């Protein structure tokens, strides 16, 4: 009898173990932020100087350390946190405030537009820069192909057109459809952006209709991310995915570091 009970218990444990293997999930933390060129969005170039560098280095480093994101997508990034002067050298932003991220994929800078992806512990296979086919300003999307737990994941950092009264919404719709078409055959996609949807979060619905999930305009409703400070009014920053479930979504508001709030979420890769 005891032998029978032992064998039944062993079989049950083996069954639980097999089920656990069949239902293996991978969870990562992803953050998306318009960092405003270290100029609070008021310029297409950094406004920080050597005299304040130590303070901002400590502040940004503490901010990113507490954030603890596996993947951090930044738009309106500035490769330099401080520009060179006649007597002092320029200061590289990755080295100064983001050196805790081993992998840095930084796209070209066009005035206000510069997209970047920082990551740790996830294999980076390649990175491509793709210009949008239709745009008012010079706009592109940065695509980093990663391998996460054996699966290929496309991670995108982008910044769509603004110009609300100058073909902004129609051009954004074209850009959104271009992204949907580009990744239609990919199982796992993570898109981080300042989508510039202004007061029209319904612009995100094209992604929903294409089978995507999202952190903003998702299960928590419309989260206001711009401008940072006491009275954000627009739902424009978002993490949009295919093949991932969203949880623990947070908006982090720090008007001293950017004119945009940061949005972060835990993403669980679905089988």
Q: Model-derived features: where do they sit?
A:
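Structured beta-strand-rich core segments of catalytic domains in phosphoester-bond hydrolases
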Residues: 71, 75-160, 251-254
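Bacterial Sec-dependent N-terminal signal peptides
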Residues: 1-23
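Surface-exposed cleft-lining segments at the edges of enzyme active sites
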Residues: 44-49, 127-133, 159-170
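Alpha-helical elements of Rossmann-like donor-binding domains used by nucleotide-donor carbohydrate transfer enzymes
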Residues: 58-62, 143, 174-178, 202, ...
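N-terminal, active-site-proximal structural segment of metallo-dependent hydrolase catalytic domains
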Residues: 18-94, 176, 269-271
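Active-site metal-binding loops of divalent metal-dependent hydrolases
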Residues: 33-35, 77, 158-160, 193-195, ...
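Loop/turn elements at helix/coil->beta-strand transitions in domains of secreted/extracellular proteins
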Residues: 24-29, 67-71, 98-102, 150-154, ...
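Metal-dependent phosphoester-hydrolase catalytic domains
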Residues: 129, 167, 181-189, 195-271
């Amino acid at each position: 009898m005891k032998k029978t009970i032992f064998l039944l218990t062993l079989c049950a444990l083996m069954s639980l173990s097999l089920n656990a293997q069949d239902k293996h999930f991978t969870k990562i933390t992803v953050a998306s932020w318009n960092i405003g060129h270290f100029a609070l969005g008021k310029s297409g170039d950094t406004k920080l100087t050597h005299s304040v560098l130590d303070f901002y280095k400590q502040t940004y480093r503490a901010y990113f350390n507490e954030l603890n994101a596996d993947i951090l997508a930044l738009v309106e990034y500035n490769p330099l946190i401080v520009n060179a002067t006649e007597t002092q050298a320029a200061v590289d932003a990755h080295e100064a405030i983001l050196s805790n991220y081993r992998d840095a994929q930084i796209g070209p800078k066009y005035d206000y537009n510069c997209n970047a992806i920082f990551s740790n512990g996830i294999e980076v296979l390649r990175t491509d820069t793709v210009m949008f086919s239709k745009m008012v300003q010079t706009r592109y999307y940065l695509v980093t192909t990663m391998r996460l737990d054996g699966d290929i994941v496309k991670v995108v950092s982008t910044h769509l057109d603004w110009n609300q009264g100058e073909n902004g919404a129609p051009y954004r719709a074209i850009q959104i459809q271009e992204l949907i078409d580009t990744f239609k055959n990919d199982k796992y996609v993570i898109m981080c952006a300042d989508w510039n949807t202004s007061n029209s979060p319904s612009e995100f619905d094209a992604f929903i209709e294409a089978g995507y999930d999202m952190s903003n305009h998702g299960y928590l409703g419309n989260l206001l991310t711009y401008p940072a400070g006491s009275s954000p009014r627009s739902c424009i920053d978002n993490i949009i995915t295919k093949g991932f479930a969203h949880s623990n979504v947070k908006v982090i508001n720090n008007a001293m570091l950017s004119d945009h709030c940061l949005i972060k979420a835990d993403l669980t890769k679905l089988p």
